[in-house]
Amino acid sequence: MASILSRMGNSRGQNSPLPPWAHSMLRSLGRSLGPLMASMAERNMKLFSGRAEPAQGEETFENWLSQVTAVLPDWHMPEEEKVRRLMRTLRGPAREVMRLLQAANPCLDVEDFLRAMKLVFGESESSVTAHSKFVNTVQEPGEKPSLYVIRLEVQLQNAIQAGVFAEREANQARLHQLLVGAEMSTDLRFRLKSLLRVYANEPERLPNFLELIRMIREEEEWEEAFIHPKRPRRSQSVERALSPTFQSSPPVMISSIDCNVIEIDDSPDDSDEDVILVEPDDPPLPSSSAGPSFLGRAVSEDQVLVIESPNIFEIQAPSTSSGAGRKNNNNFGELRRARKRKHTVHCSHCGEEGHSKETCDNESDRGQVFENLIITLQELTHTEERAREIFGEAIGLSELH
């Protein structure tokens, strides 16, 4: 009747409500037509006899059960009246069996009625199979508890349809099998056991399927975040350690034993050339493994040239104009090509810039030579101190890594 009233109200428009007498008439009509409509629906229900071969107008047990399950939500009446209507749909052996059951249990409700029908007329083999599949459903290796619960729910619904469990026992059966067949944290297991113990006589208050899934998912997310955090793979750690961003730039040491003139070129289209002069007659530079001893004593600036490199990896040794250059192998690995820098070359004989002692053609007096030499030594001393600071920082960073 409520649907009829709403339809009539919508047809007349929101601004023109029905008069009170119309509402009263429709209520009376609804009270009169209600039993008639229920009786018509009852007459349209199929019959079930329980015989092996259904007669004309009868249905198999599966079709009868599907029809009853569909109409039960529309039956707003006491349990006794529902059972009475269900009895009217039975014929033959099915009616006799349920009459005996009802005589033995006068307080029989609809749920117990349907459960008894499933046990008697349903396929007994399917009931046993459904129950066996449910109790033998356990968590597989590597399977998350949340996925196991979803797989378990399928078997539980099959068992309920086969009459193994009543609908009101679903939460209890689900929770019990979860504790038996799943691996979970100690905290979650304790909470679920406590719920099962507290609500042993009130299974409807136990968490249903969706609530149980939510509890398990929260526990899994907490474990992933705090107990089993994702660790970077070894290859990622090595790549991060080798990244130029996380490394500082140690000095590149070039010994004078290899070449006289070093030409450093950044790119093919760079027109500037840096020429670095190194004295060839000086002793070779000590190896990089003797870093502390190298810092502990004075080294002539004619023996070593220190260049600040922007990166310590994959720097290629510079090519020499005389063709005698070789790769500089040290503790820092294969070095990248150094960036170009301007270095002023002084002649130790005359003190002028732009040429070396071997190519010097100037003849100056000894006083001027010594004065120029003192100036050159002062400049090189400042360069040496700077080189020691840079080399010390590079040694410290290499020890940290």
Swiss-Prot record:
The keyword Metal-binding applies. The keyword Kinase does not apply. Residues 270-282 have a biased composition (Acidic residues). Keywords: Metal-binding, Transcription, Transcription regulation, Zinc, Zinc-finger. Interacts with SMAD1 and CREB-binding protein (CBP). Forms a protein-DNA complex through its association with SMAD1. The gene is Zcchc12. GO terms for molecular function: nucleic acid binding; SUMO binding; transcription coactivator activity; zinc ion binding. Transcriptional coactivator in the bone morphogenetic protein (BMP)-signaling pathway. It positively modulates BMP signaling by interacting with SMAD1 and associating with CBP in the transcription complex. It contributes to the BMP-induced enhancement of cholinergic-neuron-specific gene expression. Belongs to the ZCCHC12 family. A zinc finger (CCHC-type) spans 345-362. The lineage of its organism: Eukaryota, Metazoa, Chordata, Craniata, Vertebrata. One of its GO terms (biological process) is BMP signaling pathway. Residues 1-20, 270-292 are annotated as: Disordered. GO terms for cellular component: nuclear speck; nucleus; PML body. It comes from Rattus norvegicus (Rat). This is Zinc finger CCHC domain-containing protein 12.
